[in-house]
Structures are given as C-alpha cells and as structure tokens.
Amino acid sequence: MQEQYIHSEIEAEVQKYWADNKTFEVTEDPAKEKFYCLSMFPYPSGRLHMGHVRNYTIGDVVARFQRLQGKNVLQPIGWDAFGLPAENAAIKNATAPAPWTYENIDYMKNQLKMLGFGYDWSREIATCTPEYYRWEQWFFTKLYEKGLVYKKTSAVNWCPNDQTVLANEQVQDGCCWRCDTPVEQKEIPQWFIKITAYAEELLNDIDNLEGWPEQVKTMQRNWIGRSEGVEMTFKVKDSDDSFDIYTTRPDTVMGVTYVAIAAGHPLAEKAALNNPELAAFVEECKQSGTSEAELATMEKKGVATGLYAIHPLTGEEVPVWAANFVLMNYGTGAVMSVPAHDQRDYEFAKKYGLALKAVIKPADGEVDISEAAYTEKGVLFNSAEFDGLDFDGAFNAIADKLAAEGKGKRQVNFRLRDWGVSRQRYWGAPIPMVTLEDGTVMPTPEDQLPVILPEDVVMDGVQSPIKADKEWAKTQVNGQDALRETDTFDTFMESSWYYARYCSPKANEMLDPAKANYWLPVDQYIGGIEHACMHLLYFRFFHKLLRDAGLVNSNEPAKRLLTQGMVLADAFYYNNEKGARVWVSPLDVTVVEKDDKGRILKAVDTEGHELVYTGMSKMSKSKNNGIDPQVMVEKYGADTVRLFMMFASPPELTLEWQESGVEGAHRFIKRLWKLASEYSAAPATEALDVSALNADQKTLRRELHKTIAKVTDDLGRRQMFNTAVAAVMELMNHLQKAPLASAQDKALMNEALSAVVRLLYPIAPHVCFNLWRELGNSGAIEDAGWPATDESALVEDSKLIVVQVNGKVRAKLTVAADATKEQVEALGLAEDAVRKYTDGVTVRKVIYVPGKLLNIVAN
C-alpha cells in the first residue's frame, strides 16, 4: 500500500472501475427489496455550483448506504433542459438554444462523474429530446380527451420586452425579474390543466405524506387553501346585471357598506366607457403585478364606478367601487366590503369616506371601531333577525335564508387555481393541439406525434422562431389544412413526470407499467424547499393523473422528502471610482485581521483594495461568492468535498462554506489512510477471538459497535449525516491510540478498519473503495454489505456510578453491570469519601437511578 494519499490517482482509478463494470446500472429484481433514490435533476446551465453538489452528495450517500443494506438501488440522473436561460444565452452568443444546451450537458456530466456520484447513466434523459417530450404531448392529448384540459382567455402578466407571460413570482416591484421592463396585464388565450379537479384529494392526501417535512406540508395546505363559505348574488340597481361574491364570514354580511370589484371586471370596464377617471384607473391597474405579496404591500386605491348594488338580505343600496386589491382571476372578481370587521376594508373606507356599520361585538362587552376594525368572531347585533347568534349559528341561518330565497348557496372554495401551461417562448415542448380550417380545435393525432421542435433556428431576441416561421405551423389533419399551436409547455410539465420515465427511459410508450410499479413510488426524494408549492405540487398532481390513466398503481410519487439547506459563503466588496460595488470572490481575498471570536474585521483582495465584509450569504453570481466545485475537487479531492458537505451542517439547515473546514476534512481522510497504511504493513494473521479479549480490547470493541449502531441509525432513520461523520471521527481517535502489539490487537484493528471504511463509504466512496481492497478484502466494497452491530459487544461488564450526598458529588464507583440496588448502596456507604459526610448523621433516604446515580440524603 502506497504511503501517501494521492486523491487524484485514487479517484480516477476508482471511477474507471465503476464505469467499466457498470457498477450502478440496475434492472428490476423481484427477489430483492428495491430502493429508488432521486435528487431533483439539474438545469444544464453550464457549470455545477455548490448547491448542486450538496443536493447530489446527500442523494448519493442515501443511495450507497441503501445498497450496502442489500437493496436493489436505482439512482438515475438527467437534465431539465428546456427553459428561458437557453434562449437568452443563444441570443447573447448568436447561436441556437439546442447546441448551447447539449454542450452544457456534456460539461456538467463530466463534473458529476468527477464527484463520484453513483448514477445509472444508462437511464439518462434530457427533457428537450423528442424521445422524451413525445410522451408528454401524448399524455396531454389524453387529458384533453378526458376533459381535464381546456383553453380560455386569461389575464396574464405580460413583459412587452421579452414578449412572454410571467408567473406572479417573476414580477418584482411591477417589473419583469429578467429585464426590469414594467409589466402589463394582457388577456390572451391559454391552455390550462384542471388541477382544481384534484384539489380535495391533493389536500387530503397530504396527511399520508409521513416522510415529508411538516413545513412543506403546511405550505402545500396553505397553497391549496380550502375554505368553507357562502356565495351570494348582488343585483345591480336599475340594470339586468348581477355579480357573485364569496365570503368565509357570512356572519358579517349585514355590515356590508360597499362592494369592491376588480378593475378588469366586466362591470368596471362597462362603467369606464362613460367615466374618464375610472378608465384611467382601469389602465393603471393593468400595469401592476398580480402576486399576493405585491397586493399585500401596495397602496390600496379605488374609484367609484357610479353603480349601486342591492344587498341580497336588506335590499339596501351599496356603492360599487373598482379597487386595485381585487383580482379578476381570483375568486369571482368581486368582494363584499365590511369595513367595521375587516382591516383592509376599514382603511379603504377611511381613505374614501365610506360608511362603517358594526354588526359583531364581543360576547362579554361592546365593540370599539374608532381606531381599527374589530376582526374577531363574536355575537351579532344590529343584524335584524340574526341578533344574538354566534358565528356558527349566524353562518347557518344566513346561508339557509340566502338559499331559500335563491340568492346564495354554501360553497367550498380553493385558493388553488388551474395550471396555465402555455408559454409564448420557443425553447419548450410544442403544445400538441391544432386548429382546422373550419375553426375546430383538436389534439394532434397520435400518428403525428411527436410535434418536433426545430432545433436549427436563429434567435432574434424578439419573437419565438416557431411563431415567426409561418410555414412551421402549417400541417394537415384528416385531409384538412390545419395550424399548429405555437405556444410551448411550461417547463414544470417536464419535471412533473421525469421521475416515472426513469423507470423505463427507452420504452416505446410513456411508461412500462410493470417497471414503473416495481420502482415507484420514489423512496427518497431530495431537493430545495423553494419547490414546495410549484414543482412538488405538480409532481403529486401528475402522479395522480398517471394513476388514473392506469400507468401507476400508487397514490403519491415519493415516500420521503428531504429538503436540503442552501450553501452560504463569505461575501466581500469594494466601491470603485464611480461608487459602484465590485464584489470580490472569496478565493481572491486575504483576511488581515479577526476579532477574538474569529469574526473578520479587515480583508484585502489581490489588487490591494480594502474590502467591506458583508457576512455569509447564499452563493450567487451577483455577489461573486460562488466557489467552483471543480477547483475544490482538483485541490482536495471529491471525497474531501463530499465529507465536508456532510459534516459541516445537518442536511436541512444552511451550510457555511469554510475552506478551513475543507482542509480539516482532508486531514481526516489522510489520518484514515495513515492508520490503514500502518496496519497493512503488519496485518492480522489470526481471526478475532471475542472471548479472549482483555478489558481494553473489549472497551475498544464496544466503542466500535456503538459507532456502527449510531451511524446506521444516523444515515438511515434520522438522516443526520453530520453526526454520523462525527461518530466515526471520535472512533478514529480511539483507534489511533490502540496498540498493534498482539495478534488480537491486530485482529481487532482489522475488524474496526473494515467497518470504518464501510461506514464512511457512502460519504467518501473512492478512498473507502481503495482501502477495502488494501485491507485484504476480496470483491468490491459495493457488494460487501453493511457492518452489523454485535449487540453482545455493547454489554458492559461494569458501570460507573456517581455517588452524591445531599445532591453534591462525593465519589465515583465502578460496579458490576448486574449489581443490585442493595450492593451499590452498601459499596457507596462504605466509600471513605462518602463516610466523611455521613458519619455522625442520620441517613434519611437513599435514591438509586440504576446504572447511573446513587444519592444519599442525610442530616
């Protein structure tokens, strides 16, 4: 065995072995328990970042651990390859998105291999290939046939510069998140999938996601947002028009003093024709964002429409206002306003001089609305026949009366909206719908699938090439001329079912049900919590669609979910001559001074600029504080980077990147190498004889098996990888002090090192693969099996008992492990150090905590 640990040689050699032997390629084996481990696949942006490395290291640790447990482990990888960044890069680099994407895939694939991740590369998929998206198109046509797909005109956030629809989350301060252009509201026809048809099931089944973090489950419950309320109809005075509103507080309906409608509501637009002030307000609202976060923070504004609505219960006339806090695409586009009992309505009413009418008061007192609305539930007053009722009583009585008079009904509403899947971009899967000459809209026939996206295109940065190329849209269906849909799918479509395609990636059908049902559901899914309400909800929805199409037989896609924390790094900048911040990479920084707690006080860059240190923040391009994984792997080795990633923080918390910590991980691997090298110079010649071990050897073996038990639990049930590493490090301290004098010393060291390299193998697989062989074991470590805990080794011959007198420690006793209370009591009372405090006084009570503590109460 070579004396020096040279990571580059070891890692290259081991990676070649894995590739040559197809170590991680798997097939279905009904005789073995399966385990499907999946990390969210990457977007091929060009280079891996440390966030990727953390995500994929966690996945690889889980997969390798489960393999050593004897399971048939599937760990696939692929590329979420469609999306806007490829278009922007293509425009910038005067190329097409496809070659840019495929080059990035090649580069990042080599980076993943360099890190030693145990993927089944035979199952690799890229979502931008027709072999993948043809089945997505096929499935969409089947959903259309089932009535789960429809097209409607919908108000969207429109970026006039990018010529695309933006999600609410992509509108920041009323501007496009990419180009800062003010966003407009625009009505365009779009395709939708009826996720609302599954809202109840998606909500109820959250209770079955036992292996998912509570935070994700709560976020999904809130996003789906089930509420029970009443829908009621308000008629417009002197008109045949009417509109519906929905409320979860029908108990307050007698306090309605005005009604607010969206600026885009048909009634507002109609009234605006003869009202210049209202027309200007409607236009202003079209420019503002529609995210709930923006609605919560923006100034509440409105304009009177001049219309009056008739209260459905009192017959009173209430004014109708157009307001910027009501959305046309949420609920009915109209809300009843009860300023006495809703703070937003209260502030709006105060601003515009509208009436307040209190109708709810505390059960034990009067109501005061002089400073703020009273928003609690209470008892009704000022409410005619409903006076004296509490919330539940009023809810039922008012709902019943509205229903009896044909003016309303009870209703369950969901915050969740149907999924708009149309995107006005080029680099996405074409939506497989056509419009015939006679105006009929229908799915692309199955024999014409896939609808292939042309890859040899020129990006002008203005219009999608498939929208600009009028010839591309022309086709024939059933002998008629037809035009293809030129919108493409939201890229969340591809990531909603990729996990299932991995089960049979080359099948000439969407899924091979036998293979899919062998592997699914995913046993362990790993990815960021930022995906809680979008991807992770669509992922669950798609699984239910696949189930209802007879393609899978489970209800949920993943049993267990781990959401890893972000990776943070130090961030530094200086101000240039124009006063602009220039962010400097931590790799180019020299820390000149720290305080006594290790905090950075002074730092300079390579050019001598004195830097401002802003603390730890998420690695990002904007702050130039990303650390290139490749640089670290070349310097320290993949095993070191992986070990640091797993040791530095619990997986779900943020990880602070510290190169000093990476150096520490590297030193630990070198210590392990040195110990194995010393042992292999004079290895064991005898088998371990447990019955012949002396006290020190028994103690060391007990530490070994305690560590095996802890690491097994930490890597499996608890998923606390950092404490698993800490336990092995502690064991290593014992092993380094252990003698190698006798035959049994060496036999015990052989058992210990053979266990340690398997315990660390999931985390640092290259060095452990190598050491397994150097220790004289035959076969690859992947087939070695996980070390078993010898329960008998954990049994202690003796126990250390702390002896207290009146609560103060006076002695420590070593007693036989099976000593009785009476024996321990007698030994404790006989101790000289104890008798000093008990002689001449009365022992009142003796309390014994078995195996731990003896407390003598004396006075």
From Swiss-Prot:
Protein localization: Cytoplasm
UniProt cross-references to NCBIfam families, sorted A to Z: leuS_bact (TIGR00396)
Gene source species: Shewanella amazonensis (strain ATCC BAA-1098 / SB2B)
Stated name of the protein: Leucine--tRNA ligase
Alphabetized InterPro entries for the sequence: aa-tRNA-synth_I_CS (IPR001412), aa-tRNA-synth_Ia (IPR002300), Leu-tRNA-ligase (IPR002302), Leu_tRNA-synth_edit (IPR025709), M/V/L/I-tRNA-synth_anticd-bd (IPR013155), Methionyl/Leucyl_tRNA_Synth (IPR015413), Rossmann-like_a/b/a_fold (IPR014729), tRNAsynth_Ia_anticodon-bd (IPR009080)
Sequence motif 'HIGH' region, location on chain: 42-52
GO biological process: leucyl-tRNA aminoacylation
Superkingdom per UniProt: Bacteria
